[in-house]
């Protein structure tokens, strides 16, 4: 099932994974990315990295945005901190592609600042993009101090054990919806970085159980039934595809295992007519979650009106690297430069 040209099953890469060497991109894979990224895409990455070079760092002990409208409590400050995680990947990937030492230095600064004292809250919505910090770590780890490397791997272990634990933030439905998808993504990234086979096995078990419980035989997700929104179909599936991609980078075919019983491939096919623009959907009309109504009333963009199919761009680009049936759909959309490069 896997199209492994994009995610090679090199023996050396898998060996590194056992030792906790990387999350998604091994040293061999980094070379491959440099070779595959076009000059135009490299320019786009460089421009994105340049725009972030002057940013101040915003490490915090607590990051919290879940359930808050813009400007409520300290949400705005937490949004700045979450951008640190995303910028780590932008800067590290731009350095991988261009060799500009300023990008490397910025990525290293982010990692040093965050792993020095951050302890995960295990709220998978607040920390959904924390995985970007670890994806950036892949590219610059040889430039980090031994202490920072050790702290980053310890953070990965914390993410895995906490996300897979029995004590979980959120109401019971979060064990079935996108919250669990993000837990699985965070756990998978942390488990492979830790190099602990038991954690990897637990993450795989959680992944397969969640795919089975979240996606119906016809491909409809629990999130669509709960939220009546394509936005949440994408937000549910994208972290699962990232988890499957991380596993694939280590030679483990989670996507094929799940898709053999319908699973992810069925969900992607269910969404495809909407992503292609052949069908339209009015978002959140029958959502059972009260916060969705609050966001719509506050005119938060994307929480009312017709779904915009561009939201699925990154999802189908990632999917196309694991399953060739989705290449045409990925090509028809326009994934973000970071995603196109990361999965070049």
Question: Predicted regions span which residues?
Answer:
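Hydrophobic/aromatic side-chain positions at a characteristic register within alpha-helices
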Residues: 96-99, 191-195
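Short, well-ordered alpha-helical packing segments
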Residues: 92, 134, 188, 241-244
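Loop-centered beta-sheet repeat module
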Residues: 173, 177-190, 197
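Hydrophobic anchor position in alpha-helical repeat solenoids
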Residues: 87, 100, 187, 240-243
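Long, repeat-rich segments with strong aromatic
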Residues: 194, 198-282
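Extracellular glycan-targeting catalytic surfaces
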Residues: 13-173, 181, 248, 256-344
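N-terminal export signals
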Residues: 1-13
């Amino acid at each position: 099932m896997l199209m492994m040209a994009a995610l090679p099953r090199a023996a050396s890469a898998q060996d590194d994974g056992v030792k906790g060497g990387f999350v998604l991109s091994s040293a061999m894979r980094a070379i491959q990315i440099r070779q595959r990224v076009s000059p135009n895409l490299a320019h786009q990455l460089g421009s994105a990295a340049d725009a972030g070079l002057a940013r101040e760092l915003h490490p915090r002990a607590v990051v919290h945005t879940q359930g808050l409208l813009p400007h409520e409590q300290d949400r705005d400050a937490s949004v700045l901190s979450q951008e640190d995680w995303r910028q780590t990947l932008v800067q590290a990937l731009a350095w991988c592609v261009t060799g500009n030492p300023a990008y490397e230095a910025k990525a290293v600064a982010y990692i040093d600042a965050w792993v020095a004292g951050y302890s995960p809250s295990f709220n998978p919505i607040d920390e959904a993009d924390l995985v970007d910090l670890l994806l950036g770590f892949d590219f610059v780890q040889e430039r980090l101090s031994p202490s920072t490397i050790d702290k980053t791997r310890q953070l990965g272990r914390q993410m895995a054990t906490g996300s897979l634990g029995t004590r979980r933030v959120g109401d019971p439905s979060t064990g079935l919806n996108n919250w669990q998808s993000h837990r699985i993504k965070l756990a998978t990234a942390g488990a492979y970085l830790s190099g602990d086979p038991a954690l990897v096995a637990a993450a795989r078990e959680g992944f397969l159980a969640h795919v089975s419980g979240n996606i119906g035989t016809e491909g409809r997700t629990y999130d669509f039934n709960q939220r009546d929104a394509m936005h949440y179909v994408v937000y549910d599936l994208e972290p699962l595809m990232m988890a499957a991609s991380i596993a694939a980078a280590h030679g483990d075919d989670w996507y094929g295992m799940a898709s053999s019983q319908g699973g992810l491939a069925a969900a992607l096919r269910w969404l495809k007519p909407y992503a292609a623009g052949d069908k339209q959907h009015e978002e959140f009309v029958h959502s059972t979650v009260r916060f969705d109504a609050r966001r719509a009333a506050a005119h938060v963009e994307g929480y009312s009106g017709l779904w915009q199919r561009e939201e699925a761009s990154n999802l189908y680009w990632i999917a196309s690297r694991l399953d060739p049936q989705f290449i045409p759909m990925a090509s028809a959309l326009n994934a973000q430069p970071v995603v196109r490069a990361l999965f070049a």
